[in-house]
């Protein structure tokens, strides 16, 4: 799957945001308020939001954190100026559909991580090395790929690109959606039981540090 950038996205109407991230003087920013949007189930985005909050408040801004349920709601808020900044955007791949829709009203303020990547991953003990190996383990996997939220970009890409590319769209396979935390819980249970499991993951994400997992090869670059 494709590599992307993790960036800061801002509402064009919020001229204060660019100054905040450029560390302008407190005297210029004192009293101004920034609304930072995030999705609480996406822990990497939560971390970036709080780090951004600390930095902009050092420069005299006040902040409001707004927890939104889905990326579509977040990007709608950005486009309307209800949200000033989203600190964990994936503009080229994961959130491309929203940038295509709202891009004229949203400004990309720059990248903080240049090698973000969407993957399907397995525990290190897995007999699978490639996505192409998955059909041979259908019974062990119960014909399921364990995913995250239904509205997530990786879910859409998994269903619309990866499944068709590898013949997993015949009606017997499912990308199971629920939440990021539910996916991590299923991963942990499978590892504890030494069972096969395939989950949708991405870099950077803390699960790679906590669990002994590895990415499946994607020879078709789906």
Task: Show which residues each predicted segment covers.
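C-terminal motif of bacterial Sec signal peptides marking the signal peptidase cleavage site
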Residues: 22-23
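Short, well-ordered beta-strand elements
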Residues: 31-43, 63-66, 142-146
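Ligand-binding pocket segment of bilobal, Venus flytrap-like solute-binding proteins
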Residues: 83-87, 157-221
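N-terminal secretory signal peptides and thylakoid transit peptides that target proteins
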Residues: 1-16
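N-terminal segment of the mature folded domain
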Residues: 71-121
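Ligand-binding cleft/hinge of the Venus flytrap
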Residues: 52-59, 138-175
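Short helix-initiation/N-cap motifs at beta->coil->alpha
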Residues: 42, 65-76, 174-186
């Amino acid at each position: 799957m494709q590599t992307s950038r993790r960036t800061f996205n801002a509402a064009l109407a919020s001229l204060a945001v660019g100054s905040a991230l450029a560390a302008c003087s407190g005297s210029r920013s004192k009293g101004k308020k920034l609304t930072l949007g995030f999705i609480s189930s996406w822990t990497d985005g939560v971390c970036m939001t709080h780090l951004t909050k600390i930095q902009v408040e050092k420069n005299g801004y006040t902040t409001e954190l707004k927890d939104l349920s889905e990326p579509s709601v977040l990007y709608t808020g950005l486009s309307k100026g209800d949200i000033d900044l989203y600190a964990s955007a994936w503009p080229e791949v994961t959130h491309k559909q929203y940038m295509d829709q709202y891009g004229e009203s949203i400004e990309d303020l720059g990248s903080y991580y240049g090698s973000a990547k969407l993957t399907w991953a397995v525990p290190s003990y897995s007999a699978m090395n490639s996505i192409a190996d998955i059909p041979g383990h259908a019974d062990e996997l119960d014909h399921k790929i364990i995913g995250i939220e239904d509205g997530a970009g990786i879910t859409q890409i998994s269903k619309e690109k990866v499944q068709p590319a590898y013949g997993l769209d015949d009606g017997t396979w499912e990308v199971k959606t629920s939440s990021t935390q539910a996916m991590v819980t299923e991963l942990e249970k499978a590892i504890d039981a030494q069972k096969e499991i395939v989950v949708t993951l991405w870099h950077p994400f803390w699960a790679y540090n906590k669990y002994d997992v590895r990415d499946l090869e994607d020879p078709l670059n789906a």
